[in-house]
Amino acid sequence: MGKEDVIRMEGTIIEALPNAMFRVELDNGHKVLAHVSXRMRKNFIRLVPGDRVIVELSVYDLTRGRIVYRKKPE
């Protein structure tokens, strides 16, 4: 997935699944299946349901994505 063919969207984690997979509800209402990026896994970033995250979606498959950033709680 190159940088020119990704869509970055914001969403909320609604469910934690096995193997570092998460179900994320995007701000537009769609639900996608997302995995944690390698950089977040390497730095031991913990994700729990309710966290606000930024997800990268491929233009070829809009049902799967990669979690690239966890927003700080406000």
Swiss-Prot record:
Name of the protein this chain belongs to: Translation initiation factor IF-1
Keywords: Cytoplasm, Initiation factor, Protein biosynthesis, RNA-binding, rRNA-binding
Endpoints of the signal sequence: none
Residues in S1-like domain copies: 1-72
Stored InterPro entries: NA-bd_OB-fold, RNA-binding_domain_S1_IF1, S1_domain, TIF_IF1
Similarity comment: family membership: Belongs to the IF-1 family.
Gene Ontology molecular-function annotations: ribosome binding; rRNA binding; translation initiation factor activity
Gene: infA
Gene Ontology CC terms: cytosol
Job description of the protein: One of the essential components for the initiation of protein synthesis. Stabilizes the binding of IF-2 and IF-3 on the 30S subunit to which N-formylmethionyl-tRNA(fMet) subsequently binds. Helps modulate mRNA selection, yielding the 30S pre-initiation complex (PIC). Upon addition of the 50S ribosomal subunit IF-1, IF-2 and IF-3 are released leaving the mature 70S translation initiation complex.
Assembly behavior: Component of the 30S ribosomal translation pre-initiation complex which assembles on the 30S ribosome in the order IF-2 and IF-3, IF-1 and N-formylmethionyl-tRNA(fMet); mRNA recruitment can occur at any time during PIC assembly.
Pfam families with a match to the protein in the record: eIF-1a (PF01176)
Subcellular location: Cytoplasm
